[in-house]
């Protein structure tokens, strides 16, 4: 039955060449850990993507219970962690995954830098990767406020003060991010939630798509 369904879809959309192109793509010899022990460093990018997928899936689960307002945010997190089945595990995955994805991305960036993989013709992909790194940092920062506890509140105040100190654009940028330039409150929490759940993930998916397309077009650089 599944074969007939696949054949029916393939007859109309011709999807076989698409997944064949992905599945049959040969891995370069120098990135195969089975033949070169040092090739494990090429896995950092794939591991970063794997952790990112876990972050997306666990984040989708968390949004089903989280309430982004100052009266119910902390209570919703408490309920999720103590009353929802596997809630503590999923939140723990999301919490520690946020740190792990930064570590993996840092290692991936070091590998690219020290092996000179950012050089011609891959300069554009390096720029895209740096933008992904900044988006990941922003995701970690905006997600830090969402539990709405004292630690998150003071950390956000410090962050907004740093933003405000920027010349010329500091105050307008703080107002845009926080909603209210004078107090960290309901507008700040709502905006951080929207930025964390909608704006930054959209930017991340677009940049990752561009990153993967460029990798397929240009290939994986060799060792120095």
Description of each model-found segment:
Residues 1-224:
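Membrane-embedded alpha-helical bundles that constitute the cytochrome b-like, heme-associated redox core
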